[in-house]
Amino acid sequence: MELNSLRPALGSTKNRKRIGRGIGSGHGKTATKGHKGQKARSGGSIKPGFEGGQMPLQRRLPKRGFRPLDRNEYVLINLQQLDVFEAGSCVDRDAMNAKGLLKKSDLPIKVLANGDLTKALTIKADKFSKSAIDKIQAAGGKIEGISAC
């Protein structure tokens, strides 16, 4: 066997369909488009969503709601999740990431007051709820962050 005598396995390759190249090719004359009709014309494709003149589904269904362009999205962290840290430790983005608390680490963090905090922690976050601030301070912890809402 030599490299110049290698051939693809039988049935593994197909010949390209050359349309409009004479009746001997089997794909001449109408070039596989059939006779007349919309699909035989140039530019005769039917647009996506067209239902033959019936009111299309995307126009039959009502419009609903909107998404505000200036909406701020936060990663929400509850106090009960922060209770896994040791007392006196500093809890910031890196520490939360290490414990697997942040799914989307690029978003700002907001601390909510769900659950109880039993240890004094120094928590660094972008936002805190008022009740979360009260609970953290009641447990003897400190808050470091951009703002408290």
Swiss-Prot record:
One of its GO terms (cellular component) is cytosolic large ribosomal subunit. One of its GO terms (biological process) is translation. Keywords: Ribonucleoprotein, Ribosomal protein, RNA-binding, rRNA-binding. Gene3D superfamilies: 3.100.10.10. One of its GO terms (molecular function) is structural constituent of ribosome. Pfam families: Ribosomal_L27A. Residues 30-39 have a biased composition (Basic residues). Residues 1-61 are annotated as: Disordered. Part of the 50S ribosomal subunit. Belongs to the universal ribosomal protein uL15 family. HAMAP family: Ribosomal_uL15. Binds to the 23S rRNA. This is Large ribosomal subunit protein uL15. The lineage of its organism: Bacteria, Pseudomonadati, Thermodesulfobacteriota, Desulfuromonadia, Geobacterales.
